[in-house]
Amino acid sequence: MSVSQVTDASFKQEVINNNLPVLVDFWAPWCGPCRMVSPVVDEIAEEYESSIKVVKINTDDNPTIAAEYGIRSIPTLMIFKAGERVDTVIGAVPKSTLASTLNKYIS
């Protein structure tokens, strides 16, 4: 499963109303650490394709959702399950850290 881009308009449908846990990558094109974590997010999407959905949202183009979730630094990775935010990882973290965080929410 590839990583989908979501917008302020599609966030509710793609993330909140999703039956699977969803990993949301809040990022911006000018953000160096975002570019560092992007391949990790892509790998997670491939490895967990049957268990989770992975989406990215550009905070510059979609400020409403970023503000709603209090995004103050990027990259911020949030995990949603059953429409609720259940965890947040801030910064460019190693794949192992992200994977262990995700594993807590995969049934």
Curated annotation (Swiss-Prot):
InterPro entries named among the record's database cross-references: Thioredoxin, Thioredoxin-like_sf, Thioredoxin_CS, Thioredoxin_domain
Keyword Coiled coil annotated: no
Matches recorded under Pfam families: Thioredoxin
Domain of life assignment: Eukaryota
PROSITE patterns found in the cross-reference section: THIOREDOXIN_1, THIOREDOXIN_2
Subcellular location per the Swiss-Prot or TrEMBL entry: Plastid, Chloroplast
Name of the molecule in the record: Thioredoxin
The organism of origin for this protein: Pyropia yezoensis
